[in-house]
């Protein structure tokens, strides 16, 4: 299910003295089946942008085409329920939205709300909890008896139980320890590969953006600043830093090595393994030349 923004503008508190423009002139497409990252400094428009993906926000100007659904400025989309089934959104700290007395009831809430029978919802809950790497035995437990990481997985299972075609992740690993962050990101990538899910990840973690995303969209002051593969985007390191976007650690180490040893590493290395390989190659070629990047 392809998603396309055309000349999208969004203003909060439109036509009031408190009006504030959060998005403008946003032109971007997310073809079906891809893995995308949206990055940018705090306040760049990332969260506003993703709230247009399932009709939580409507553009002030422009259009958002989500599969067969067209959301236009000034026109109310009447069939948002089917859209919200197809586009699942995992907001920051989704565990704060848990409220039922058992894990099973919490996961079943979404499917039953969309008209699925109780028995079918239970089947979906069992599949979903296994997808997020939890034991089915937890279905009878209170979600509030679980660890923070388990609670987050339960909340994500509630989104997956609706079997969305698009999974939107807003800082999904915020507040987790490094091990929990890595496990969750690997889980999302596995779902993307095995289920063919389109994944749109909003993140401040540049390592995650570089490692997982096929395409990266850089937002700045409410519009698209850069778009391309990780290699293309992070080759603009100086420009990214000027707009407050962090760089992957491998690029920071690359700069430090170039400055320390007076060598030039031409390739934009996006992992420490790549960086090690490139340094070895340069040194083998006698690369002690003045640093040019």
From Swiss-Prot:
GO terms for molecular function: ATP binding; ATP hydrolysis activity; ATPase-coupled transmembrane transporter activity. The keyword Cytoplasm does not apply. ATP binds at residues 40-47. The keyword Cell wall biogenesis/degradation does not apply. It is an enzyme of class 7 (translocase). It is a peripheral membrane protein. It comes from the Bacteria. Its EC number is 7.-.-.-. Pfam families: ABC_tran (PF00005). GO terms for cellular component: ATP-binding cassette (ABC) transporter complex. SMART domains: AAA. It is found in: Cell membrane. Residues 3-246 form the ABC transporter domain. Keywords: ATP-binding, Cell membrane, Membrane, Nucleotide-binding, Translocase, Transport. ATP-binding (A) component of a common energy-coupling factor (ECF) ABC-transporter complex. Unlike classic ABC transporters this ECF transporter provides the energy necessary to transport a number of different substrates. Forms a stable energy-coupling factor (ECF) transporter complex composed of 2 membrane-embedded substrate-binding proteins (S component), 2 ATP-binding proteins (A component) and 2 transmembrane proteins (T component). Belongs to the ABC transporter superfamily. Energy-coupling factor EcfA family. PANTHER family: ENERGY-COUPLING FACTOR TRANSPORTER ATP-BINDING PROTEIN ECFA2 (PTHR43553:SF27), HEAVY METAL TRANSPORTER (PTHR43553). This is Energy-coupling factor transporter ATP-binding protein EcfA2. It comes from Bacillus cereus (strain ATCC 14579 / DSM 31 / CCUG 7414 / JCM 2152 / NBRC 15305 / NCIMB 9373 / NCTC 2599 / NRRL B-3711). The lineage of its organism: Bacteria, Bacillati, Bacillota, Bacilli, Bacillales.
